[in-house]
Swiss-Prot record:
This is Cytoplasmic FMR1-interacting protein 1. InterPro entries: CYRIA/CYRIB_Rac1-bd, Cytoplasmic_FMR1-int. The gene is CYFIP1. It holds the Pfam family FragX_IP. Breakpoint hotspot for the Prader-Willi/Angelman syndromes and may be implicated in autism. Commonly altered in tumors. GO terms for cellular component: cytosol; extracellular exosome; extracellular region; focal adhesion; lamellipodium; neuron projection; perinuclear region of cytoplasm; postsynapse. It comes from Homo sapiens (Human). Its main location: cytoplasm.
Amino acid sequence: MAAQVTLEDALSNVDLLEELPLPDQQPCIEPPPSSLLYQPNFNTNFEDRNAFVTGIARYIEQATVHSSMNEMLEEGQEYAVMLYTWRSCSRAIPQVKCNEQPNRVEIYEKTVEVLEPEVTKLMNFMYFQRNAIERFCGEVRRLCHAERRKDFVSEAYLITLGKFINMFAVLDELKNMKCSVKNDHSAYKRAAQFLRKMADPQSIQESQNLSMFLANHNKITQSLQQQLEVISGYEELLADIVNLCVDYYENRMYLTPSEKHMLLKVMGFGLYLMDGSVSNIYKLDAKKRINLSKIDKYFKQLQVVPLFGDMQIELARYIKTSAHYEENKSRWTCTSSGSSPQYNICEQMIQIREDHMRFISELARYSNSEVVTGSGRQEAQKTDAEYRKLFDLALQGLQLLSQWSAHVMEVYSWKLVHPTDKYSNKDCPDSAEEYERATRYNYTSEEKFALVEVIAMIKGLQVLMGRMESVFNHAIRHTVYAALQDFSQVTLREPLRQAIKKKKNVIQSVLQAIRKTVCDWETGHEPFNDPALRGEKDPKSGFDIKVPRRAVGPSSTQLYMVRTMLESLIADKSGSKKTLRSSLEGPTILDIEKFHRESFFYTHLINFSETLQQCCDLSQLWFREFFLELTMGRRIQFPIEMSMPWILTDHILETKEASMMEYVLYSLDLYNDSAHYALTRFNKQFLYDEIEAEVNLCFDQFVYKLADQIFAYYKVMAGSLLLDKRLRSECKNQGATIHLPPSNRYETLLKQRHVQLLGRSIDLNRLITQRVSAAMYKSLELAIGRFESEDLTSIVELDGLLEINRMTHKLLSRYLTLDGFDAMFREANHNVSAPYGRITLHVFWELNYDFLPNYCYNGSTNRFVRTVLPFSQEFQRDKQPNAQPQYLHGSKALNLAYSSIYGSYRNFVGPPHFQVICRLLGYQGIAVVMEELLKVVKSLLQGTILQYVKTLMEVMPKICRLPRHEYGSPGILEFFHHQLKDIVEYAELKTVCFQNLREVGNAILFCLLIEQSLSLEEVCDLLHAAPFQNILPRVHVKEGERLDAKMKRLESKYAPLHLVPLIERLGTPQQIAIAREGDLLTKERLCCGLSMFEVILTRIRSFLDDPIWRGPLPSNGVMHVDECVEFHRLWSAMQFVYCIPVGTHEFTVEQCFGDGLHWAGCMIIVLLGQQRRFAVLDFCYHLLKVQKHDGKDEIIKNVPLKKMVERIRKFQILNDEIITILDKYLKSGDGEGTPVEHVRCFQPPIHQSLASS
């Protein structure tokens, strides 16, 4: 029975589940991260050779030689790395200026201390190349011995010798290139001689030898050639090596790019070594020993190959520098100048895309069944053919990857050898450095895109193949095992039978050695009763051999032994006069050749993950030690603008090419390759540190540019979506097209949550979110800043900018976790903790300093326009902040379009502006502004206006009766003109006094119009909220139908939308309270008919507390009739003044002050309750009545009567309208029902003649 698990343990186990990483749905647009799994290395370097006692002894001995040569090659690689990554130490050490310098001993001691370990390495390098040359020449001498010349030499052996030739070529070029090595040695030698470090003659001699070795160019090549030329027949062996390389290259018997380039270098350097004083390659060609025309063709196709790091070699150089080139110059085409089509990557792209598409489609079929559906777990159910298909697929994939990687490196190599100049590229400045001309200015836009695309294909396919690694590994081991066992147990059975039968002992021993080396018998041993072993035929019933199936590959030694022994059977050379090949039958030879060719790739495929990585390695695109050496210490490192990974990344960002945007992370991955290579192959921490420093800088730049682009893209998108469609079509008709932004693929990049770079996992989404949030905030800041630097009319543009930002926020929020737009807006508006924000403050500021004193209201258009004659000083505003288009409407074209739209709102303040003010200020902001406006009105009414009223009351006539009709209108006009002479001639009346009244009137009108706009907003709210509050419209009822039944049906239909019961059922107490309050507020806001304007008028009435407004109590106890002591008589006098028509070049009171002046006067009259007296006793109205009756027109004291009466008529209509509106608002609060008339009884009036009696 299972052990009991306690509840506590069970809960802790469940908690642990949270720590399990769950794969997210992030789109894969980056290469695979560095594997944390081990890459097993099954290459034993023939350490297990002695175990194969059944093998042919000679090949076991050869394996021993191979083993030591491989070790030497590894050591050579280490010296190549040492030379390539050598940075000058002597430049960093302070130099001794003169012999009298006091601290020179100390400097020399430090120099020796620092440089001694480095010079020791150089000394070891000199010894190594001596030993290597001796070893190589020893092998050549052994193989060229007269007795051994007919012997068979295996391909593996020849290729190893070829690798030696390649090593010598690389080491010599590196030694030639590195001046810093010689300089460091010289500095050390100087210091050591001064300190007498090298006393014994031997060390002096060795030091001298090292100096000569380092100073002499091509020293290694010369030594090698000298020692080879004394060996008789050395050119025959070299010809074999070169021919093998030609054969391998022709039949594509290579897998990694480095193997391909090595074959070419061995051909070139091999020919150079063969063409000397002893031998002549052209004679060998004539004897058909080598094929120079074929080599020439390959060298023409691929003129430049990578040598080491960023060092390249032109293959034709080996030919040009050979001994007999001059007299045979005409035979070579590769030495002529001119580019090979191989380097035109743009033309190659069609083929590469086709290959990529074809292979990806094929791979996807297997990938979907193996990885996605998980059927790959049932390994045992697959047939040999299915495994073979997977095996072929793996090989084909590796070959494609290798081909593309080689292609990229070859184009890069060609460009490094052929830098551009100002004639080839007009963008290239004269002052450009060598490396800059080779990288930054050396690629066209198309070439950069082609490189990016190929790199993306390489890295993308690497991901897909990496995912199937386990599937491929199993299939490869299974297929290799099956092929090896079928071949050894079944295919070789017939030739073995023939050899035994015909007593061909050598072939028999080789075949049996092969079978003993690799056969894995079903029963554990070779069947004893096999007729073939006796040279007999199989029985008629057949002899069944069951070959087992396992997923186990052969060891590296096993594979080498089998291939070498098979090769010996079909080789053209063998120790005796007659070759073994001639003793074999035709089909057998074909079988052996086929297996030998196929098994060439087994070693690579068995080490699948390592080979995959080598085929995709583009690390050399970053290394630049050769070009740094050329700067002679002027440069410690090159800037990122010259670095290939950044050049490609930046090109995508700068061009904003949509089809390339998803590839941007692949070009950044080149840094991963280089860093991995610096640590694992070069073993140099300082190179890794330099790569890391560049990555830090580049990634910052990348995020900065990408975030800016993304923000700008979505801002343009928002601006385009919100742009008036009619304007767009109108512009199109006029021939100016406002383009919609082309679609781009930022979504995939925005979904990247864990980008792998130098072993770090980076949340790209979060980094972009931070930058976009900052840009969003800056946009809002800028919109408000622009508003603060302009007048009140620009509030419509502010609203438009905020809407575009809101839309941008909405579009971006699909992919980024941004703060809420309202929270961002409040922060930009400085309205988080403060009760009112920047917009509210600026609205009031503008109202106070510009709107009230400088705008004229026109009741007909319901708009304010700027006055023609300003009375206040011009208002100074802040300078408008500068801004890039993406922080405004998105682009220059959109900025122009929107500017033209908002331009039509610039010359007035009207309903559109008030609606925006209501939306942006909200209840709180409006309350603040109105409170402040009331303070302004109070200060005016109790300040300057009161002073003018007092002053003007003093110059008013004490009594001014309304003359009788008999006097006629001209007489009455003359009478009033005379009576009001002091008022008419009062200088400040038409300026300061009217200006102050206009300010009060504008303030009143602002409050009224704001309330009207607010009502519209509230009605809109109410209608939007109605379906959620169970407020349903009455339905149409036909005759005979009942209304309540229909309404019930409607209510039940909309019940799920009714919010309050829903929240009462499902919500928390806090949510229920909020829902109820919201419901109540929405319902009651308009229903109870609250009026803000009435409250404002009531407040203003309280400001009119001075007795001068109402005058003393009437002597008759009822009202003043003829006395001029109440405000309405003063206003009548003012009205008389502004009704007088003006001259031709003068401004009317309407132009200067607008309707605000009349609103102020009428409001004061209404608030004082004098409106009816004003209507009855006004001077102008009296004149209008009389003139209407008699219809006269005269010019009295320069005043045309008819024109004046015309003006009076207009103002009477305006006054009546204003007074009616004010009356309506003031009476809105009176009790409902019939109005109560207040009646007072007075004594009937007595005529004056009777009164005295």
